[in-house]
Amino acid sequence: MPPELPIEHEMKSSVRGMYLASHFYNFWHAAPMEEVTPFIEDLALWGCNTLMLCLAPQHYRSFTSPEAFETADRLKKIFACAAELGIAPALILFSNTGFLDRSEDIAAPWDMRGEYITPNYAELHKEICPNLPGGMDEIRRCHREFFELFSDVPVKYFAYWAYDEGGCTCDACSRWSENGFIKVYEESVKPLLSEYFPDAKLILSTWHFDRHLRDEGKRLYENLSAGKYPWAEYVMAVYGDGQFMPLTAEHGAPDGRSVIDFPEISMWGGKPWGGYGANPLTMRLDNFFSSVGDVLDGGFPYSEGFWENINEFCCMSHYSGAHADTADAVRDYVRFYFGINDPEPLLRAVELLEITLWRKVETMPDGRLRVTPHFPAAIREAYRLVTEADAAMNDTAKRDPRWRIIYLRAVIDYELYTHDFIPMNSARAQKCFRELWALYHAYDTRIQPAVCPPLGR
């Protein structure tokens, strides 16, 4: 099929990114590079021009440790692969998160106090209070080691992170996003960025804004509109998480800043993420994109693995302007990867898999799981459409990991539906989970439960 876009096609957005969350021993963290590379090549084909990765301090005793060096080396290999394809590197920059052995003498409190409406969320709570004696010195040490570790990478963007991980609820740091967070930037991030990465651009992330403090997004929007934080050339907004995105949609980008999004395309629908196969969110993404119009300048979708490959494609399609909506994007995805001339049945199957994605996961008294989709009525039809497509495909398309995760999702859900929603009741479901384990490289004993399919449960 000849290309439909003219050769002079102008990309819609300037930041066509993807965030591969390389942690928890998920696919991006553990899979062999020869399996990761084809997915990065796909991103380049779709129009991606920047790739964000993460090295989180709370998992290491130092960024000079052998374990940190090992992970950093992997990230650099991913960056090098991307660079060969014209994709620029980006990194998450934690504000006040410390190392695994962070001293309790400088620990940031995270309980509810003052204006806080929830405790500060973090996985390991290794945050450092910048206002305690020695706190800012330790934050600077963490940042310097981080910048030194990646000083041989031409990082284009750093996404400066306030929460998850990050934050401090003490009186001296409150309100964190307007006070302690800014103090850390001024006294640690700013001078070290100038020293190590003077040409890098800074993205201010609003992840978890308005979860801990009321009106956080609104106050940020007002502060930016008034010209504050001129170093924040980009602002990362989050759908359905606070006030910043709705204000941007209604009034435009504040003070001419470039606003980008951070679509959550991996975790929605329940744990374990990707544990049942593909998790298409194409209609949800359409709602997101249509809610803000053309005010955004791209984004970094949040990927925990390749089970959301079709969601990545839809996001890149939106950023590039290649398709009018996600339905058209899915049609082209089905034609290109699976060699199917009539994409309508599989488009319908993808939509049904999205409808049946959201599920309740319970552990029964005997230890077995019960997994109940909230809208199970469409499971049989999705299964019929997917298995009929599988029967018509050639062997190469059938073996494609992009297809296997769709096929396995339809089969697993059908087996749940016909076996009282208890995975252990179906030998066929267990066989599918084993295949997902192999696809995700979940046999690494260090893998976290959140990204491990529920084999044997």
Predicted regions and their residues:
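Short, surface-exposed loop and linker segments with low hydrophobicity and enrichment for Pro/Ser/Thr
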Residues: K12, R140, F147-E148, V292-D294, ...
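C-terminal non-catalytic alpha-helical accessory regions
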Residues: S303-E308, H323-R457
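An acidic-aromatic substrate-binding cleft motif
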Residues: P2-T50, C54
